[in-house]
């Protein structure tokens, strides 16, 4: 039986930290679904279609990654995709409490859904999409934190 995992997030935009997690997940699971949440309440900078396209290009070198957008409840999405593993990145202790609440709720909604937490590599442990966008808005150099295609899209968006 194939091990199918979902790595959900807003990915507004996808960063090298996200790529670190998804790349490592591809070594642990047969199929990884990078599930990009519509998240209209977060007022994303990039549309869902833009985020999906950026992530598809950034992960094209990974053979077992599928990038899809979604707006459903995560447990329902996982059930529909026949996945029973959720991958979540934990940057710091501050992330853990929220992630624990999500894991418990997801397990309540779908008892066979396991959450697997991965720590990003030290190089990426302090970055987030929000922080990268904020630095870029103030003309800070964020080249190191983003895949090339995403960096260009962010610069174009901020013009």
Curated annotation (Swiss-Prot):
Q: Which reaction(s) does the protein catalyse, per the Swiss-Prot or TrEMBL entry?
A: (R)-4'-phosphopantetheine + ATP + H(+) = 3'-dephospho-CoA + diphosphate
Q: Give the EC number.
A: 2.7.7.3
GO function terms (MF aspect) = ATP binding; pantetheine-phosphate adenylyltransferase activity
**Domain of life assignment:** Bacteria
Q: In which pathway does it act?
A: Cofactor biosynthesis; coenzyme A biosynthesis; CoA from (R)-pantothenate: step 4/5
The site annotation (Transition state stabilizer) covers 18
**Which keywords label this protein?**
ATP-binding, Coenzyme A biosynthesis, Cytoplasm, Magnesium, Nucleotide-binding, Nucleotidyltransferase, Transferase
Record GO biological process: coenzyme A biosynthetic process
Residues where substrate binds: 10, 42, 74, 88
**Which residues are involved in binding ATP?**
10-11, 18, 89-91, 99, 124-130
Q: Does the keyword Transferase apply?
A: yes
Q: Which cofactor does it need?
A: Mg(2+)
Q: Which NCBIfam families match?
A: coaD_prev_kdtB (TIGR01510), cyt_tran_rel (TIGR00125)
Q: How does it assemble?
A: Homohexamer.
Question: Per the similarity annotation, which family is this?
Answer: Belongs to the bacterial CoaD family.
Q: What does this protein do?
A: Reversibly transfers an adenylyl group from ATP to 4'-phosphopantetheine, yielding dephospho-CoA (dPCoA) and pyrophosphate.
Protein name from the UniProt record: Phosphopantetheine adenylyltransferase
State the organism of origin: Salmonella typhimurium (strain LT2 / SGSC1412 / ATCC 700720)
């Amino acid at each position: 039986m194939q091990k199918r995992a979902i790595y959900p997030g807003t990915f507004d935009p996808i960063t090298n930290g996200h790529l670190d997690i998804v790349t490592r997940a591809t070594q642990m699971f047969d199929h990884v679904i990078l599930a990009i949440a519509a998240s209209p309440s977060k007022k994303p900078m990039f549309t869902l279609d833009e985020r999906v396209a950026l992530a598809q290009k950034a992960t094209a070198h990974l053979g077992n990654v599928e990038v899809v957008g979604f707006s459903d409840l995560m447990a329902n999405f996982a059930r529909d995709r026949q996945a029973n593993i959720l991958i979540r990145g934990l940057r710091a202790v501050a992330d853990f409490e929220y992630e624990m609440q999500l894991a418990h709720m997801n397990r309540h909604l779908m008892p066979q859904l396991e959450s697997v937490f991965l720590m990003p590599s030290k190089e990426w442990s302090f970055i987030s999409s929000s922080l990268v966008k904020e630095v870029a808005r103030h003309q800070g150099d964020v080249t190191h934190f983003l895949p090339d295609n995403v960096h260009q899209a962010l610069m174009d968006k901020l013009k």
